[in-house]
């Protein structure tokens, strides 16, 4: 079979002006970035606000293998299948970070015959959103350092600046740096560091803001440092929220592209789900809901991370909760959770599927806690055997969860028809009655304990010395009513990435809390989650090139 980029480059793209007409968007409603990309205007988003929202389908997954389980591919294939069935459908997905594209992924626009296009542009600079977020973030860093240099009227303690610089690349050498070295004219020397752009609070803010006014308010509410007497310093104290909003005035507009089958797609924002809330923008999802009868969206990594955050953090900012949740599972991942070594995953092993099913079963049970109907999608791989597929289907039937095999990677929309029919049937027959896991009035401690015991199935939560102190401080600052966003490994329910399957009787340790008051949540740090990834021994970048005619090579 052709590579992803070969398939993408073989497709005759339709002008984006034609694609968007399918959902009632005119040429005057968009701002073109070439022939095949556009941004949606504020005027159009405002005009559709009164529309009744359509059905919302959330795609999530089991705890993934390092290669991922195909959520984006499944989301795209499902949307294409729904459109093939005559349902007016839109996609609402995250945009890729250049760091993982150059590092391990090599691309993140779907795969096979379930891709969003133009995939080369989407995977590289797209419409410049990532650069705008990077610029806004680093402008704030420069303004903080300038405040120190120009007399430090706010009394900022340089040792307690928590705002870091960012870069949209994987660069481990920048995790910890010292800035301001040299003569006094170069600034105040202090420790600093870089995160990857998608870990920036500004990325989370962009994805949760409902309009420019809300964006400006959220930017003003960012905590950047503490004073010498340990009081928080906000962006509003620096009086630069207007400038940051100005930098982001176009980046906040959702991007319009198309799938291989011509399904309109809104691709906007891309926070990671292991260190942030892992969902595309509220503006993109809300607008898609008001333009289409069905909206398909995804949440990053497994349901214990992205879906939990979607349901507890994002949904309160949306016009409605999901009508159905699709959990993507692969037999290779289930076998890995069942104890099979990565090198042996291609061999048939029904017993390992049975053992690994405990992971999928827990995710199904977790999503059912939110009172939303669940469907399991088996993402088919070439090495899957009939016996393994039959084993998994039988196990799903035992817990009374609908299950369908989907081959959208190999067969595109046709490979997702059975799944699409089941999802539509479930939505029609089972009304969602969304219930949040916790209340805003719960303390931070109670929220963390709820997530750990009810979603991870952990025994208890251990709060480290710093976290214990912060629980008291954050309550004093009035931050204890915010939602919790757990920073945790994506590979396990626990904070130990090697503890696969469905572990029980484990503790989760919260070593520190990080206030993201602009985004509107508090991050709980567990384990050793990195906010600036490194590159692998053989980065995907080594296979990339460009032909003399400008055609991209090596993206996959």
From Swiss-Prot:
PROSITE patterns, per the entry: FTHFS_1 (PS00721), FTHFS_2 (PS00722)
Residue sites binding ATP per the record: 65-72
EC number: 6.3.4.3
InterPro entries on file: Formate_THF_ligase (IPR000559), Formate_THF_ligase_CS (IPR020628), P-loop_NTPase (IPR027417)
Keywords noted in UniProt: ATP-binding, Ligase, Nucleotide-binding, One-carbon metabolism
Pfam families: FTHFS
GO BP, sorted A to Z: tetrahydrofolate interconversion
Biochemical pathway: One-carbon metabolism; tetrahydrofolate interconversion
GO molecular function, one term: ATP binding
Enzymatic reactions: (6S)-5,6,7,8-tetrahydrofolate + formate + ATP = (6R)-10-formyltetrahydrofolate + ADP + phosphate
Family: Belongs to the formate--tetrahydrofolate ligase family.
Annotated NCBIfam families: PRK13505.1
Name the record gives this protein: Formate--tetrahydrofolate ligase 1
Phylogenetic placement of the source organism: Bacteria, Bacillati, Bacillota, Bacilli, Lactobacillales
